[in-house]
Structure formats: structure tokens, C-alpha cells
Amino acid sequence: MFSGKVRAFIDEELFHSNRNNSSDGLSLDTPLAIHTPAKGFDADLSPQSLYDLHTVTTPVTPLAPDEWDFSLDQSSGVIPSPSSFLSDHNNNNLFSDDTISRQYSNTDDINPSDFGGQCAILDSQNFTLSNASTKSKWSFTKHGSNTPSDSSSPLCNSSKRVVGMLRRFLPSSRMVRLSKAHQPLRIPTTGVSLDSADLTPLSVSTSHLNHPSTSNSPDPLYSASQPPSIKTDASPVDIKNMDAAEKLKKIDLLLEEILQLDSAYDAAERRMIESGWSSVDEIRDVHNKRLDAWSEWKQKLLPLKKCC
């Protein structure tokens, strides 16, 4: 049943126990729980029997109940600060009554930062730990401490999760909330980085609107609603004198213009909604100007369609 090493160990234990015992049998002083033969051992022992064999060479003397009696009143209940412990660690009477009364008799002269938020100073003259929960002048924990208990607390973990969630919804660019006295907010649509210093949240500016005829306009939204008029604006007389090829070219220019305008307004409205810095009235104002641009574009396209 047992391997060779286990059987050799058991035989050695039996040999020593047999030599210590008397010739007539086991002595009363030997703390054996079972009787085992000295030679010819072939019994099927249980784990409890192996434990009893081990007690032959390693007897255990239990302690008396009064030896375990411990009272908090017999020991000092004051926890020294780190600095005071380093200064007095060579003193054999560190926790004596005289040292405690000399160091902590006047708690007003003690600097709270000296304790690092990790120990309590008791007002009780008995200096017992039983009053620590009601007599502490400073809390046991300090804000920002990196102890394992603080870092693993549910409150700390939940705070980290809340911060991470808020960062996902806060805008990453530097946007300033303008007052109601300003013009409606503007957002860039092309070629402007979100980290630009001169960025305003809402501004409709496209490359095809930088023509000199619209550069003097005070409102970029107004210029966006007014398409370039170099080739697209034509009088009815000019349209009648055009041939079919010129009319088709004019229609192509109008189509390209309205597509660029619609893309610019669509990007502006989408970014106004996603950023969260624009009110509903500001978004509605940009959308109305988008509809006005469509209406003006249709008025320009209508004469060309009649002539085709």
C-alpha cells in the first residue's frame, strides 16, 4: 500500500520508539495512541495512525488556558507616528507609560501631517484601543493615499469608471461657450484642425466660397447661402443666346455648386449636434439657411431647364 520511502520512514520511527520503550511494553510517559509491533510491521495504517506515530518523536505540550489570557488594558493602545518611531526605535521603553504620557499628554502640539493619516491620537488617559473609534482626532485614511485597501475599494474603482465614461462624452477640442449676445456659433467643415487656436465651434467655410465677390461679407453663413455668381448667374437674355453646349456646361456648374453647398451644410449640422455646444435654435438657423440656399439654386436652374 505504501511506497518504499514511506515504509522506510515508518520502520525508522518504529525502531526508535521500540528502543525508547521498556522490554515489557510501552511506557506510560510515551504519548502513543496505538500499540504497534517493533518488528514484522505489515499493518494497514490509516492517516490518523500515521499522525499518532509521528507523535512518538514530536510530543506536543498544550498551553494552559490562563496562558492565553490577553487584555488590551495591559498593553499600550497608542500607535506611534512614523517619525516618532524612527527617532525612538533604539529606546527599549518606547511603549512605557512614562514615554506615552510625555509624548501624547498634549495632543494640540502634534502636527497632524506627521501621522500621514494612518494612526489615531486618543484623548483617553488610559490609551486603550477600545476608545479608538470614538476618540480619534484624525481619520485613519487620507484623501489620495495609495494603500492597497484604498486602491481596491469599490468607491475608488467606481470613480475611475465614471471619469473614463465622462471623458468619452466630453469634447476633445478647445471650444468656448459663447454668450447669447454673439452671433450663432460656427463650425469648420473643411481643412481646419479641431486643435486650432482660432477655432470657433460652428463655421461654414468651404473652398469654393473664397471668391472676392463674397470675401467682404460679414457673415460666413450669408456667403454660404450666396453661391458664386461668376458663371452661374446669367440673365435671361444671355441664356437665350447660349448654345446647347454652353447651357449643359452651366447646368453642370450649378450641380457641382449645390453639391458642395449641401455637403458643407450637412457637415455643419452634424457637427453642431455631435459637439453638444450648440442650442436647438442655432442648429435650426443653420438648417433654414441650408433650405434658402437650395431655393436660390433652384431659381437659377429653372431658366436653364426651360431652354433645354
From Swiss-Prot:
Keywords assigned by UniProt, alphabetized: Cytoplasm
Chain spans, region Disordered: 138-157, 205-235
Polar residues compositional bias, start-end: 138-148, 205-229
Major site of localization recorded for this protein: cytoplasm
Record carries keyword Cytoplasm: yes
Protein's UniProt keywords contain Membrane: no
Subcellular location: Cytoplasm
GO CC terms, sorted: cell division site; cell tip; cytosol
Residue spans crossing the bilayer: none
Protein name: Uncharacterized protein P4H10.14c
Organism, scientific name: Schizosaccharomyces pombe (strain 972 / ATCC 24843)
